[in-house]
A protein has these predicted regions:
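Middle-to-C-terminal accessory/interaction subdomains
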Residues: 1-50, 54-167
């Protein structure tokens, strides 16, 4: 991706044969939406299936270790604006800590391939109006809080802290 033009054609066709590039877009959208402060250099994961005859042969990004979201934890990645007012569409403003290139790959795909650019914009708008909407997120987060809350007394007894501090 770094050394080839990603305009529609042979180079991009090869990338599509190896990488589910939409998962990279979704990965960036979700992490930027929740203002994850620990993802570009540390908690990045990708996988593919090992069965050559299976349907999971392309590399794809996956979410994990999401405790540094919504302004919690330490800003290890150096996100320029970790507040709720951060611009989720400012891929160019994200750093490339550790030189791992995830940001550069997405930026190059968006800038050189109209299909990727269109997908990124439309998908982000769709998510903003559905799964990222306040109504949906508040309901989801409240349900998660209700699921986790009964465990917090035992958790703080074992690991320290307080339930009040967790809330």
């Amino acid at each position: 991706i770094h050394s080839n033009n990603m305009a529609p054609g042979t180079n991009f066709d090869y990338v599509q044969s190896q990488l589910k590039w939409k998962s990279l877009c979704d990965y960036f959208m979700f992490n930027s939406y929740v203002v994850n402060q620990d993802w570009l250099n540390w908690n990045t994961a990708w996988w593919r299936g090992m069965d050559p005859a299976g349907d999971k042969t392309k590399w794809r990004y996956t979410l994990w270790d999401m405790d540094a979201t919504f302004g919690h934890y330490v800003n290890y990645t150096g996100i320029p604006d970790p507040t709720a007012n951060a611009d989720p569409c400012n891929v160019e403003g994200l750093p490339n800590p550790g030189g791992q290139g995830h940001t550069d790959i997405l930026e190059k795909l968006i800038n050189e391939n109209p299909e990727v650019e269109q997908y990124y914009v439309q998908r982000y708008v769709d998510l903003a109006n559905t799964y990222f909407s306040c109504d949906y997120m508040i309901t989801l987060l409240d349900s998660m809080l209700n699921e986790i809350s009964p465990e917090m007394t035992r958790h703080t007894a074992k690991w320290g802290g307080s339930v009040a501090g967790w809330n």
